[in-house]
């Protein structure tokens, strides 16, 4: 009678238990070898990746419409009046009846519950803000004349919920009526996947904005070099192409009517190698200002209310750009000792990194009589994730 692998393992476990010794004292090397599968070669990785791709496509397609795009669910009258627009349900229905030009919602049955898209909810909110009670705030708070607030979600430990936190906050802000831009700085592209972004290569990520910032600096530097009779630093084809790209070329809409996206994909990681090369060529280039300056120059911060930056699990050049650009820093961490310990080390590295930038810049600033550099954030908060008090 041929014994199965399970029966063999059970017998070995029983033998170890009867002898009073740990199970590993009774491992039979030959039997263990027979339990192993065939060796895995590199080609197997491609097969696994292909299988994962098919599974991902299947799962993602379940939330798509007939055109293959992600679609956002509808909102009921009860949800709208309970959470989104501060009006009583009977009054809400009376307003719709009195204003047939307003979105009337969809109903599966005659006289049944009405369901609305988020775009329709935003139109209804605008109507109530204009025609409704002046004692109520229908639109979200937004000081006039100020740029968008930028929120970075960062921690160099992976798996703490950075992307989930940023995505949920972006969606919550959108439900409140804010105009939201999400910038994915993580080459894994998880945030991009959440919002159904399509990113073919690094030229549809933030990379060309960083390259354009460097190219513009190099142009100014080269003019000074020419004035001094020195040879200019050449602009290669990459930098020349980057000068043609604006943020508007990179921003794509999502299935949320008031959330836009600058996505990411694997080639974005190339920035982590290219940025230090540029910095070595031009030591005066302030790489940490690249993202902020380009977003400001392209009017992005005036077109949105809140910008969320999802950073990679590392304190590299992309993360430094995101942190330097942000007004608010959120640091997610799980409720465990290891994650608490790692987060403490993250703050230590934040201090070392930004302090070294300040020290290097301010030495030159003091010598030239210029204002000193000081990084500041309006708020820094640790966000405990994956915790249930029960």
Language model regions located:
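P-loop NTP-binding core
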Residues: 2-83, 89-90, 94, 101-390
């Amino acid at each position: 009678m041929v014994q199965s692998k399970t029966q063999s393992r059970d017998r070995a476990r029983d033998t170890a238990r009867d002898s009073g010794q740990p199970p590993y004292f009774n491992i039979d090397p030959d039997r263990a070898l027979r339990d192993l599968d065939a060796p895995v070669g590199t080609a197997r990785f491609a097969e696994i990746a292909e299988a994962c791709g098919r599974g991902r496509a299947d799962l993602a397609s379940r939330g798509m419409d007939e055109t293959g795009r992600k679609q956002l669910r509808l909102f009921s009258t009860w949800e709208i009046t309970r959470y989104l627009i501060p009006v009583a349900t009977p009054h809400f229905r009376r307003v719709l009846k009195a204003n047939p030009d307003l979105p009337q919602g969809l109903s599966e049955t005659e006289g049944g519950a009405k369901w609305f898209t988020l775009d329709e909810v935003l139109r209804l909110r605008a109507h109530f803000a204009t025609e409704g009670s002046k004692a109520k705030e229908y639109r979200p708070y937004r000081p006039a004349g100020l740029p968008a607030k930028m929120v970075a979600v960062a921690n160099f430990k992976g798996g703490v919920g950075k992307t989930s936190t940023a995505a949920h906050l972006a969606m919550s802000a959108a439900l409140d009526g804010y105009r939201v831009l999400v910038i994915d700085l993580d080459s894994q592209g998880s945030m991009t996947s959440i919002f159904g972004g399509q990113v073919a290569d690094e030229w549809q990520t933030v990379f060309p904005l960083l390259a354009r910032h460097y190219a513009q600096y190099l142009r100014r530097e080269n003019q000074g070099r020419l004035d001094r009779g020195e040879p200019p630093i050449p602009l290669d084809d990459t930098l020349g192409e980057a000068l043609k790209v604006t943020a508007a070329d990179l921003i794509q809409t999502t299935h949320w009517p008031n959330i836009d996206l600058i996505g990411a994909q694997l080639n974005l990681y190339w920035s982590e190698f290219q940025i230090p090369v540029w910095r070595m060529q031009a030591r005066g280039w302030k790489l940490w200002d690249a993202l902020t300056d380009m977003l400001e120059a392209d009017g992005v911060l005036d077109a949105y209310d809140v910008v969320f930056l999802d950073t990679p699990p590392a304190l590299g050049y992309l993360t430094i750009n995101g942190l330097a650009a942000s007004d608010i820093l959120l640091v997610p961490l799980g409720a465990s000792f290891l994650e608490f310990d790692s987060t403490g080390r993250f703050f230590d590295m934040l201090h070392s990194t930004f302090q070294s930038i300040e020290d290097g810049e301010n030495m030159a600033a003091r010598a030239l009589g210029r204002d000193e550099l000081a990084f500041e954030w309006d708020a820094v908060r640790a966000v405990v994730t994956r915790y249930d008090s029960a």
